[in-house]
Amino acid sequence: VLPKLIEDVGHVDIARAAVIGGWMFAAFSLAQFVFAPMMGNLADRFGRRPLLLLAIFGLGMDFILMALAPTLEWLFAGRIIAGICGSSWIIASAFIADVTAPDDRAKAYGLMGAAFGVGFVIGPAIGGLLGELGPRVPFWVAAAISLLNFVYGFFVLPESLAPENRRAFQLWRANPFGAFRVFASYPGVLP
């Protein structure tokens, strides 16, 4: 769906749209890499619920931005926003750890992984079908689903991190390269 939208917005051929789409995917991935530790740290400070809801709402707004995008720059901005909001998977993982017993945690993470897998299979198929109606239609539908998800979460999603278990925001914990320090403790995982 995105390549067709890039073609339309950027007035480029499919080959150039594929290259631009690759750069947009890189921008999305870089945003996730940079913001995942920050989101996790903010969730440790303010709780899981507000950041999950903010990310879901942000994703809905991002899909609207993508649907309305008049330029390639808007599409790039949209992919970066999607990466930032998408980095909330780290908060969802923490939420699962908060609300499940240790013996049930592997099952809960397995269900979360399965849900991601189903989404990666069904999402593009549905997006492709909706794309037949126009390259912006899938983004409008995704925005509606995200915003409905936000409303549902607003009324149903509990806070999983008690105030006494929260900790101050620490910039060093929000460093995306901090994970590499962990690898130094396990030299067997390094090439």
Summary of predicted features, one role per range:
Residues 29-37, 87, 120-121:
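Residue-level signature of mid-helix packing/kink "hotspots" within the transmembrane helices
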Residues 33-70:
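Conserved MFS/SLC helix-loop-helix module at the cytosolic interface between two early adjacent transmembrane helices
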Residues 62-66, 82, 153:
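MFS-fold secondary transporters
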Residues 71-79, 191:
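Short hydrophobic/alpha-helical segments at membrane-entry points of transmembrane helices
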Residues 78-117:
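Cytoplasmic helix-loop-helix junction between adjacent transmembrane helices
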